[in-house]
From Swiss-Prot:
The protein, known as: Ribonuclease HII
EC class of the enzyme, as a word: hydrolase
GO molecular function: manganese ion binding; RNA binding; RNA-DNA hybrid ribonuclease activity
Catalytic activity: Endonucleolytic cleavage to 5'-phosphomonoester
PROSITE patterns named in the record: RNASE_H_2
GO biological process per UniProt: DNA replication, removal of RNA primer; mismatch repair
Keyword list, A-Z: Cytoplasm, Endonuclease, Hydrolase, Manganese, Metal-binding, Nuclease
Transmembrane segments: none
Native species: Rickettsia akari (strain Hartford)
Cofactor(s) it depends on: Mn(2+); Mg(2+)
Function: Endonuclease that specifically degrades the RNA of RNA-DNA hybrids.
Gene behind this protein: rnhB
């Protein structure tokens, strides 16, 4: 049975609905990025789904379509702030800022995951990137934005292979940490670091 990715958008059809997702909670280096997207129900872009289920090429194509056709915003919380406030609080902060950065104020904010927010407009949906088109669109924007940032950082610190691992704790990345030590962009509050 195919999931109706517009279920939540239809449920709240009388409201301006934004979807939010993040990229970068688990990596050992780099920022966490959240994106907020308000889709246009009259202009549905086909092929949008959870960014993890798309090829890099397809994500890039959909990124261009989403950013050209929908209201969207991003928020970036640095590795330094993650170390200060922890990854959960950094993720929640990024989500709140992304929603606030939209040039249209959402009345309902659908967020992937099970995080709790004090703002009652925020509704957390476990597995939301597979259940809501606006969250899935946000997952694409967040993932592409973060991957591009890590590609830029990889040019400065090529030994960590961030252009391939996006800062995640792959075998090669851990070996590079052991050999070269931490870069200025590693999260020092994470176990390996």
């Amino acid at each position: 049975m195919e999931v109706d990715l517009l279920h939540f958008e239809k449920k709240y059809h009388n409201y301006i609905v934004a979807g939010i997702d993040e990229a970068g909670r688990g990596p050992l280096a780099g920022p966490v990025v959240a994106s907020a997207v308000i889709i246009d129900n009259a202009n549905i872009i086909h092929g949008i789904k959870d960014s993890k289920k798309l090829s890099k090429k397809k994500r890039a194509l959909l990124y261009e379509q989403i950013t050209s056709n929908y209201v969207w915003a991003v928020a970036i919380i640095t590795h330094t702030e993650i170390d200060k406030i922890n990854i959960l609080e950094a993720t929640k902060k990024a989500c709140s800022i992304a929603a606030a950065n939209l040039n249209v104020k959402p009345e309902i904010v659908l967020v992937d995951g099970n995080m709790q927010f004090s703002d009652e407009r925020f509704i957390s949906i476990v597995n939301g990137d597979n259940l809501s088109l606006s969250i899935a669109a946000a997952s694409i924007i967040a993932k592409v934005t973060r991957d591009r940032l890590m590609l830029e950082l990889s040019a400065k610190f090529p030994q960590y292979l961030w252009h391939k691992n996006s800062g995640y704790g792959t075998k090669e990345h851990l070996e590079a940490i052991n050999k070269y030590g931490l870069s200025p962009y590693h999260r020092k509050s994470f176990k390996c670091c």
